């Protein structure tokens, strides 16, 4: 299945010069959505994953069903102030400024095997920050999986030696 057929590309969004890859059309297509979840699940099935960790918001769309498929728990990573209990946080750079991601402090136990799942890998800043949160709590990042990868932005380079996979690659 060619997932690009199910991903809407919007030039000039959110600003001029950007070509936005919209996965909402993919999740509307039940075959493409199931295929995406199944393929990521197949990639992770032999990695003994305890937990899937996914950043808000679109990471939840793929991370939670993958966790269910492989029999793992699911941990949401949220923007600052959205989680009710004690958290750990990491600040990361955006194109214009900074943002903060948080995870509950008790979300991961030392030694748990974690896969990070998100809709898109661009510069790698978000996923690198999520990996730092996982490792700060003693988890081991065993894979980072994406539906879409924007290869020209070299996000994989920022992820170092992490085992990564993506279902669709675009040159921006």
UniProtKB/Swiss-Prot annotation:
Catalytic activity entry: AMP + diphosphate = 5-phospho-alpha-D-ribose 1-diphosphate + adenine
GO biological process: adenine salvage; AMP salvage; purine ribonucleoside salvage
Family: Belongs to the purine/pyrimidine phosphoribosyltransferase family.
Descriptive protein name: Adenine phosphoribosyltransferase
Organism: Clostridium acetobutylicum (strain ATCC 824 / DSM 792 / JCM 1419 / IAM 19013 / LMG 5710 / NBRC 13948 / NRRL B-527 / VKM B-1787 / 2291 / W)
General function of this protein: Catalyzes a salvage reaction resulting in the formation of AMP, that is energically less costly than de novo synthesis.
EC number: 2.4.2.7
Record flagged with keyword Cytoplasm: yes
GO molecular function: adenine binding; adenine phosphoribosyltransferase activity; AMP binding
Coiled coil (residue ranges): none
Alphabetical keyword list: Cytoplasm, Glycosyltransferase, Purine salvage, Transferase
Gene3D superfamilies: 3.40.50.2020
Short name of any one Pfam family annotated for the protein: Pribosyltran
Assembly, per entry: Homodimer.
HAMAP family in the record: Aden_phosphoribosyltr
One term under GO cellular component: cytoplasm
Localisation per UniProt entry: Cytoplasm
Lineage: superkingdom: Bacteria
Pathway(s) of this molecule: Purine metabolism; AMP biosynthesis via salvage pathway; AMP from adenine: step 1/1
């Amino acid at each position: 299945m060619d997932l690009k057929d199910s991903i809407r590309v919007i030039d000039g969004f959110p600003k001029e010069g950007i070509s936005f890859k919209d996965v909402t059309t993919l999740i509307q297509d039940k075959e493409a959505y199931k295929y995406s979840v199944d393929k990521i699940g197949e990639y992770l099935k032999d990695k003994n994953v305890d937990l899937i960790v996914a950043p808000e918001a679109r990471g939840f769309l793929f991370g939670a069903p993958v966790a269910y498929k492989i029999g793992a728990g699911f941990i949401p990573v949220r923007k600052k102030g959205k989680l009710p209990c004690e958290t750990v946080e990491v600040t990361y750079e955006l194109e214009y400024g900074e943002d903060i991601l948080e995870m509950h402090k008790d979300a991961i136990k030392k030694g748990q095997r974690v896969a990070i799942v998100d809709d898109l890998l661009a510069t790698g800043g978000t996923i690198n920050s999520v990996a730092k949160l996982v490792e700060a709590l003693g988890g081991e990042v065993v894979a980072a999986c994406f539906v879409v990868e924007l290869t020209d932005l070299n996000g994989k380079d920022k992820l170092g030696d992490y085992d990564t996979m993506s279902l669709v690659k675009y040159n921006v």
